[in-house]
Amino acid sequence: MTVYRVEPTHRALADADEAFLWIYDEAPESALRWYDGLLDAFKSLGKNPTRCSLAQENPFFENEIRQLLYGRYRILFTLRGKTVYILRVRHGAREHLTPETSKE
């Protein structure tokens, strides 16, 4: 089985931190569990990342965009060679990314 290196981008880590802080304001213990689970979800992409579906945003991007669902959040990522680049962590209720908003 091929093992992929997993590289979260700065933007994805900032998204994760922002979500953590939002959850923490309401439920600190839940936020800690959520963040630990998110990191486990990141790591899981090292094995068979193509098991994840194409994201709805995929047709609008040059590179293939896939998603891993984690609770109410979507982990958006792309594959390049044997590396998984985690691009964003977005709440499922948020508008879909466009090439313009993907870097916000």
Q: Which functions belong to the PLM regions below?
A:
Residues M1-I65:
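Basic, Lys/Arg-enriched alpha-helical interface segments
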Residues Y70-E104:
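Enriched for short, Lys/Arg-rich terminal
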